[in-house]
Amino acid sequence: LPHFSKSILEALREPLEDNKILISRVNSKIMYETKFIFIAAMNPCPCGNLLSSLKECRCNELEIQRYKNRLSEPCLDRIDLYVVMNDSFSDNKNIVSSKELHENVIKAFSKQKNRGQKELNGKLSEEDIKRYCILDDEAKEILEKARLNYQLTFRSINKVLKVARTIADLNDNEI
């Protein structure tokens, strides 16, 4: 992801946030709907070995910071989920088969539809988040601590709620 130009990365902000993009030309403007799943990858550092247990990182702190800073905070704020991938070894006993995963996703979609949602969790509006992502007092307290500790923006809090709702649906839980 950081290897794309800054202008391309910043151009992703509108479609990621608003599900639309405005193309302006000399005499006209055209609005296109942009419903898509954004999946991206980046190394933890320029050499790619920062989190490796097998190889040594060759980067200094300045290089790592410069690499990470290629993505602006507003751009990062529009990404729903970050997953850090460590070295993987085949002795993991918690592997879920593709078939099981597929079945869980279908059940989660059905659960969302039965709840009356017009959109999947990832595309819920602010109003729908309040309707479908209901937290008990303990969850509210945990979210407030996270907001303060990680300086979460309003947008980030909504993303946390949508991801939590999705995880709950996949695990067949209410919340």
Feature map (PLM): residue ranges:
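Conserved Walker B
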Residues: 1-4
